[in-house]
């Protein structure tokens, strides 16, 4: 599922067990991937499998990640590299994409649900920051493998909108209102300039509008699903 912030649904998932699995609907899984995740996840930790592209099926989409909590920027390790021995090591990481993640019930009860104000994109970044703050380790477990279609809406106007707005939200979270306004000025100005140029050239709304609108909505405190 893409709108993973509706994680009140986790309550139903964990009612009969000790784990919840979040999995995008643009994935295919190997028959034993969940068995391996459950068997190899250390106690009290969150984990994810190795994620390969569907096409080509031997190319890495995600092999663990790195997160800078100050900027909210993340790096997918191994992206677009051919799968091989260098991606076969179980390791602790600072970021896990919620394209597929195994969450123990105890961790959900400790850290809470995903932030619904984000609605879409960056919810995994926020949650990984909270996991780190709570001392919950995150593990990349390469023996478990899934394939991800990827692409989809990535790079489109909506994804740029949510990423722009939600990244500003994350970098300003816990800061003063004055800091948030100051942090938004540059994205507002650059977004406005690029969108104005797009209109001047007679092009349709696209990435430039998404970035501009994302900054505007954050400035105005509009979170959740994009309206209008």
Question: Which residue ranges define each predicted feature?
Answer:
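A short, conserved beta-strand element in the Rossmann-like catalytic core
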Residues: 2, 26-29, 52, 119, ...
């Amino acid at each position: 599922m893409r709108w993973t912030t509706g994680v009140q649904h986790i309550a139903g998932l964990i009612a009969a067990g000790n784990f919840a699995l979040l999995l995008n609907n643009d994935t295919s899984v190997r028959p034993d991937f969940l068995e391996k995740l459950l068997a190899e996840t250390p106690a009290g930790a969150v984990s994810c499998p190795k994620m390969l592209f569907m096409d080509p099926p031997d190319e890495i989409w995600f092999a663990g990640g790195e997160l800078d909590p100050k900027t909210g920027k993340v790096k997918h390790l191994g992206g677009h590299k051919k799968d091989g021995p260098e991606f076969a090591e179980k390791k602790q990481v600072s970021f896990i994409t919620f394209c597929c993640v195994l969450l123990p019930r105890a961790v959900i009860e400790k850290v809470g649900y995903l932030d619904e104000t984000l609605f879409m994109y960056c919810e995994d970044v926020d949650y990984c920051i909270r996991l780190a703050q709570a001392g919950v380790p995150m593990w990349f477990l390469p023996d478990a493998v899934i394939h991800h279609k990827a692409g989809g809406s990535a790079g489109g106007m909506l994804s740029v909108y949510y990423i722009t707005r939600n990244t500003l939200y994350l970098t300003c979270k816990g800061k003063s209102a004055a800091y948030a306004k100051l942090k938004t000025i540059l994205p507002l100005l650059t977004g406005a300039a690029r969108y104005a140029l797009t209109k001047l050239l007679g092009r349709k709304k696209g990435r430039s509008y998404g970035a501009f609108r994302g900054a505007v909505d954050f400035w105005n405190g509009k979170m959740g699903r994009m309206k209008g």
